[in-house]
Amino acid sequence: MTSARLRKSVARVTRPAVPLKDIKGAYPQLAPDKDYPPLKFKSLKGKVSAAEWQARVDCACAYRLVRHFGMDDLVYNHISARIPGKEEFLLNPLGMMYDEMCASSLIKVDLDGNVLWEPEFPKGLGYKFNPAGYVIHSAVHRAKPAIHCVIHTHSIAGMAVASFKRGLLPMTQTALRFEKVAYHDYEGVAIELEERERLVADLGDADVMLLRNHGTLAVGASVGEAFNSAYRLERACRTQALAMSAGEEILLPSREVIEKTNYAYRATTRRSYGILEWPAMRRLADRIDPSYKQ
């Protein structure tokens, strides 16, 4: 990298969502020997609008499903849901496992990062939202009002394919579900507000994006639509990583077949994703543990 390019690169990294010198204070500092009982939350049902409550239930359900299908990463990563008709969205408290998440545990923030509501935690658990989560999710919700859900994962397969130079290959029918796959180059931990503009520009009108050397991003007009994209992208990445690890030459369909399949999978050709699948996913979550609705 030339000195001029280096100066330009350094100059643009100037305004983090949390100043780097204060980054430690942005995360809860916990006593490691403390006994932490199971988390319980006072229900917000009837205390928020019906639209917000539905968004909370669906978002919490998505967390449980991401955990169920093995796409989570301990307490990290994030799923957000926009509150319909508002410039506000829901984020997870950093420190909770995905299978602990419930409708009344989600933090409500506005597009500027102001906390509008947060749950009460036992003494010693000052869980807040992840600054990197705010940067990534506010970028999409600010620029794309039609997007109501954003899902970011660090799945093993997603990170692997995001690090392949060729990215996601059109090698399976599942991969061909995505006519457009966006890519965003890695810039370090996503705490710089300036990265939001570049992230949204790279996303364009795609439903999914591979964050180079990082993970995956899926967006949708509903939680069900975003989850469907996240799940399908994960399946496509797993298949590709497994196939490439075998060392065999990968057979790709012809360009004609790729375009034909892309067309068949367009929402305008058939239906928006999530309409058929999401009720079934909700029923699955209910069978596993309906406490996400609390």
Predicted regions and their residues:
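A conserved C-terminal secondary-structure "cap"
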Residues: 5-59, 207-210, 215-294
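An anion-binding catalytic pocket shared by soluble metabolic enzymes
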Residues: 49, 56-151, 158-169, 174
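Divalent metal-coordination and catalytic microenvironments
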Residues: 81, 140, 154, 199, ...
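A short glycine-/small-residue-rich loop at the edge of a beta-strand within enzyme catalytic domains
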Residues: 131, 186-190, 194, 217-224, ...
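A general structural signal for well-ordered alpha-helical packing
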Residues: 137, 196-200, 223, 227-230
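Short, intrinsically disordered, mixed-charge
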Residues: 142-145, 166, 201-204, 232-235
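Short gly/pro-enriched beta-turn/loop segments at secondary-structure junctions
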Residues: 145-146, 176-179, 202-206, 210-213
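Class I SAM-dependent methyltransferase SAM-binding "motif I" and its flanking Rossmann-like core
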Residues: 153-200
